[in-house]
């Protein structure tokens, strides 16, 4: 198997929806096929690269633009870019899609908010409820349901593992092809 074109795959969903977990599982699938890939995890990239630690609306737009710039640089290499971040508005996602054109796929990790709140591995929802943080998607910031995702993964309902569904999508779109 080989990659036929540059592609970035953007995972979106609530905090604790399973974006990073699925991104890692998908990367392992690509590794098995010897297809080079890299993950941009929202939390890690913010800590490593961005000065801006704020999560207000203006900062989130600035963050989306920064991810876009990084994506354009990384896409010059022939690899799969996997981006795990919530980009919670359709405006943010449309901006990225418009700029990356046919090098963009959107995967919506559709996990109910109540499930995300129960998982809460980073204690974000708990901190929000106690008034310790604000600007939380699923708290005081609304997550806008994507209107044009390439794939919707319902973590509680799907029988096929998400990473297999994504791989199937890439094969169907001939982004990954047999090397015969």
Where are the regions that the model predicts?
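Conserved lysine of the Walker
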Residues: 19
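Small-molecule kinase domains that catalyze NTP-dependent phosphoryl transfer to phosphate-bearing small molecules
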Residues: 110-113, 118-165, 172-180
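The conserved Walker
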Residues: 15
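Glycine-rich phosphate-binding loop used to anchor ATP phosphates in small-molecule kinases
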Residues: 48, 58-106, 125-128, 135-136
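Conserved substrate/cofactor phosphate-moiety recognition/catalytic segment
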Residues: 23-72
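Conserved beta-strand scaffold positions in the cores of enzyme catalytic domains, especially
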Residues: 32, 39, 104-108, 150-152
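Hydrophobic anchor at the beta1->P-loop junction of P-loop NTPases
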Residues: 11
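Extreme N-terminal, non-catalytic leader segments
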Residues: 1-8
């Amino acid at each position: 198997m080989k990659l036929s074109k540059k592609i970035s795959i953007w995972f979106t969903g609530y905090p604790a929806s399973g974006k990073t977990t699925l991104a890692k599982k998908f990367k392992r699938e690509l590794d098995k096929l010897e297809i080079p890939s890299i993950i941009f995890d929202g939390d890690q990239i913010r800590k490593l690269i961005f000065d801006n630690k704020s999560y207000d609306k203006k900062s989130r737009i600035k963050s989306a633009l920064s991810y876009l710039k990084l994506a354009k640089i990384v896409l010059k290499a022939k690899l799969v870019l996997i981006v795990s971040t919530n980009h919670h508005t359709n405006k943010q996602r449309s901006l990225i899609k418009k700029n990356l054109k046919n090098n963009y796929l959107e995967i919506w990790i559709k996990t109910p908010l109540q499930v995300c709140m129960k998982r809460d591995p980073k204690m974000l929802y708990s901190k929000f409820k106690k008034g310790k943080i604000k600007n939380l998607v699923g708290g005081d910031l609304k997550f806008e349901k994507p209107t044009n995702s390439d794939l919707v993964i319902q973590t509680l309902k799907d029988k096929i593992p998400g990473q297999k569904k994504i791989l199937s999508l890439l094969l169907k779109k001939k982004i990954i092809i047999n090397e015969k």
